[in-house]
């Protein structure tokens, strides 16, 4: 009895010692991610650091025993994710502060390791606590009647109506005016997805043609989009009740999340193609999950819907094509490794390839019908353009006279001096597609040669142009200083907000309009601790990535495969022109699905 007591006491002392050591490591490791607010001494020589240490010791002393006694697999995955998270936090802090990461600074790697050691037991605990909470969340009484699809759809749509009237006729922003101009001028290009150009511009121009005015056309498009987007979100909630046993109370919570959290109504009334694109991606992912759980039901009822959603996903955004095509081999490989039913896996591959063929055929027909011009390369070359411009700005001596001459052939000096590390729009608009097309090999070689000499400059050019997608503390203000039709971007460019010509804003609820203006253009929600993270693309991605890593830990490989289009879509925006919420809207839409996907299937 005494031996057992001594053993327990030693274990307790050991756990406490572990908690103290790891807490100190984590407190020191946080120095790198806190330095963004100023000199690191403001953190290291502060009472706040002591509070962090004290609270960490208490928390870790409660959970470290469970982590240390967990399986080797759990520890490995926890350390992998924690290391990646720590690296993201440290690099992101440096990029936010100085638009640069010093990869030769050994302290960076030391701080990354220390913080990773601290985060690992916390990550492990969150995985376990999350699974326990989900099992309680998805328990439904046998006699409990949930909400049906139409009820959920109506509730979400109605909750969005005040925002629609506050921003009436809708937020006609981003590429909307360009797409409308293509329609009225009958001069089309492949720069924007033709299907969306014809749909948006066609509805607005038709309203003008029959005498109702552009505002009516924009309002009609907005209401139709609200109907489609709310229907897809309603389908997601209804499916969670039908398949996972989500009870009525938690259905209502999901409805309120979709109906009231500002990002959803904000993009429901926004004319950008991203809203309908996101709706299609969500349907594709949900149906992929259904396929992995019940293939026979999928092929009996849902395969046509899957093909339709897949085709429209590719029609609405070009990077949707890249993500979808990349997902085919990813799903195939995971399916083979995980020993998924070969017949059903083959049928899924055929459906996905068929969807791609239908997309190509549809897009080609639209191109022929509209005589759309092609031959633009700057969107695909956004990152190389930024990399060359960064070297030109910070290390111009790298270029020889001949290389400088070649650079000016595709990027005139007047544009090179406009280099902005966080957005490439102005710079890439000066890219000479014709010159590049004449000798791609020469200019590709120029890019490669300069990169071999300045690899860290290239790496920083890419990271600073995309870090907001994986770093939670970035203030999204990529358009700062840009004059728009009705305002100038100053402190924030979180959302476009305005109604551009040919539309005109007529708000019925000015106070609500003011709230959304604050969210969009000012440091409003960013000033509120914790709440600010819910609006941050980087934070939402960390939640998504942590969930995926948890699925891998639990060997739920087919669920990982089902989410692969979202991960691959996220990967494509890392190669994009800038950092905006609209490009990763799917990360918020997928949250309720993530919450419930660990629950066992329940027949309702």
Q: Which ranges hold each PLM region?
A:
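Short acidic/glycine- and proline-prone juxtamembrane loop motifs at membrane-interface regions
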Residues: 266-277
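Short helix- or helix-capping micro-motifs
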Residues: 251-262, 310-314
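Membrane-interface anchor segments at the N-terminal boundary of transmembrane helices
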Residues: 35-52, 216-220, 465-562
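Specific aromatic-rich, kink-prone transmembrane helix
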Residues: 277-294, 310, 590-594
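Membrane-proximal stem/loop segments at transmembrane-domain junctions that anchor or position
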Residues: 370-506
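Membrane-interface alpha helices of multi-pass inner-membrane proteins
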Residues: 302-317, 329, 352-358
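Extracytoplasmic catalytic/substrate-binding loops of multi-pass membrane glycan-assembly enzymes
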Residues: 167-179, 187-203, 211-212, 216, ...
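Transmembrane-helix motifs of polytopic, lipid-linked glycan transferases
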Residues: 223-245, 283
């Amino acid at each position: 009895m005494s031996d057992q007591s001594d053993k327990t006491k030693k274990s307790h002392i050991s756990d406490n010692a572990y908690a103290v050591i790891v807490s100190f490591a984590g407190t020191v490791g946080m120095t790198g991610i806190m330095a963004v607010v100023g000199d690191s001494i403001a953190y290291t020589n502060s009472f706040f650091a002591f509070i962090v240490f004290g609270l960490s010791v208490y928390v870790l002393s409660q959970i470290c025993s469970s982590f240390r006694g967990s399986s080797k697999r759990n520890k490995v995955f926890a350390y992998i994710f924690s290391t990646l998270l720590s690296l993201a936090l440290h690099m992101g802090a440096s990029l936010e502060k100085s638009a640069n990461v010093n990869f030769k600074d050994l302290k960076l790697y030391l701080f990354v390791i220390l913080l990773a050691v601290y985060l690992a037991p916390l990550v492990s605990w969150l995985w376990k606590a999350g699974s326990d909470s989900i099992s309680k969340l998805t328990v439904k009484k046998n006699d409990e009647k949930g909400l049906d699809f139409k009820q959920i759809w109506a509730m979400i749509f109605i909750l969005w109506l005040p925002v629609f009237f506050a921003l009436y006729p809708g937020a006609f922003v981003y590429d909307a005016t360009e797409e409308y101009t293509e329609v009225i001028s009958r001069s089309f290009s492949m720069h924007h997805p033709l299907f969306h150009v014809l749909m948006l511009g066609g509805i607005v121009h038709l309203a003008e043609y029959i005498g109702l005015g552009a505002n009516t056309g924009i309002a009609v498009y907005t209401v139709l989009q609200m109907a489609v987007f709310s229907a897809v979100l309603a389908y997601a909630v209804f499916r969670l009740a039908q398949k996972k046993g989500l009870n009525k109370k938690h259905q209502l919570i999901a409805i309120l999340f979709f109906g009231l959290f500002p990002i959803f109504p904000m993009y429901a009334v926004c004319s950008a193609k991203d809203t309908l694109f996101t709706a299609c991606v969500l349907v594709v992912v949900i149906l992929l999950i259904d396929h992995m759980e019940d293939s026979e039901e999928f092929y009996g009822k849902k395969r046509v819907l899957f093909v339709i959603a897949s085709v429209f996903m590719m029609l609405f955004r070009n990077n949707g094509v890249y993500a979808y095509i990349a997902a085919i081999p990813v799903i195939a490989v995971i399916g083979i490794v995980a020993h998924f039913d070969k017949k059903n896996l083959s049928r899924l591959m055929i459906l996905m390839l068929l969807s791609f063929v239908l997309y190509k055929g549809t897009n080609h027909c639209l191109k022929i019908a509209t005589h759309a011009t092609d031959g633009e390369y700057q969107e695909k070359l956004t990152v190389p353009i930024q990399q060359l411009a960064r070297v030109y700005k910070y290390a111009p001596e790298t270029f020889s006279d001949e290389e400088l001459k070649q650079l000016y052939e595709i990027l005139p000096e007047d544009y090179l001096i406009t280099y902005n590390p966080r957005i490439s729009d102005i710079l890439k608009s000066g890219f000479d597609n014709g010159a590049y097309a004449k000798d791609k090999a020469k200019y590709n070689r120029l890019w490669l040669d300069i990169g071999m000499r300045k690899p860290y400059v290239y790496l920083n050019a890419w990271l600073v142009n995309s870090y907001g997608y994986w770093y939670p503390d970035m203030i999204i203000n990529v358009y700062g200083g840009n004059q728009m039709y009705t305002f100038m971007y100053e402190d924030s460019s979180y959302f476009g907000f305005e109604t551009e010509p040919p539309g005109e804003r007529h708000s019925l609820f000015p106070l609500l309009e003011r709230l959304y203006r604050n969210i969009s253009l000012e440091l409003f929600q960013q000033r509120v601790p914790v709440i600010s993270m819910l609006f941050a693309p980087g934070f939402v991605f960390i939640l998504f990535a942590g969930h995926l890593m948890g699925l891998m830990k639990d060997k739920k490989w087919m669920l990982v495969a089902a989410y692969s289009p979202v991960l691959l879509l996220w990967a494509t925006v890392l190669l994009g022109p800038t950092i905006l919420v609209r490009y990763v809207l799917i990360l918020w839409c997928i949250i309720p699905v993530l919450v419930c996907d660990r629950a066992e299937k329940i027949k309702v």
